[in-house]
Amino acid sequence: MSWITPKKAIMLAAAAEGGTKLNAFDNALLKMGIGNVNLVKLSSVIPAHIEWLDELPKNIPIGMLLPTVYTHIESDEPGSTISAALGIGLSEGNEGGLIYEYSGYCKKEEAEEMVKKMVEEGFRVRGWKLKEIKIVSAEITVKDKPAAAVAAVVMFPY
């Protein structure tokens, strides 16, 4: 198997309920449009000159391996609010960037603030110039079924 550096990426987030916590996670992936692929978990570096998409490419093959940075949380505790957030920091000149993720028992605004701080610190410790921060998040309050919140950056080789 050979890997190539991704050329395109998209930020996604969703929350969903399900019959089990795993089904809730799967349902959130389906809501995002990535429930029928295999997510290959990555760490946090964005390749230089990546193109950011506004919508998923059409006809992604079932079972395709897609490099992905993601965070998720599931709960079956009625009344609890859970959130997942993912933030990207883009450098001057699109020479690369960083992705940070957070999920927890909190409102999405708290999760968003956490990833914003992480992006800023990641750039600071590297001595990189931060041009822009983008954040996606999802929040759900558990009712009578298990729930999940998921946030992801999915990368594509084409």
Swiss-Prot record:
Molecular-function GO term, any one: arginine decarboxylase activity
Cofactor(s) this protein requires: pyruvate
Residues bearing PTM Pyruvic acid (Ser): S44
Alphabetized SUPFAM superfamilies for the sequence: Pyruvoyl-dependent histidine and arginine decarboxylases
Bound cofactor: record note: Binds 1 pyruvoyl group covalently per subunit.
Enzymatic reactions: L-arginine + H(+) = agmatine + CO2
Key words of the record: Decarboxylase, Lyase, Pyruvate
Gene encoding the protein: pdaD
Listed name of the protein: Pyruvoyl-dependent arginine decarboxylase
Coiled coil: none
Residues carrying the site annotation Cleavage (non-hydrolytic): S43, S44
GO annotation terms (biological process): arginine catabolic process
Organism: Pyrococcus furiosus (strain ATCC 43587 / DSM 3638 / JCM 8422 / Vc1)
Protein EC: 4.1.1.19
Pfam families reported for this sequence: PvlArgDC
Keyword Manganese: no
Main enzyme class: lyase
Protein family membership: Belongs to the PdaD family.
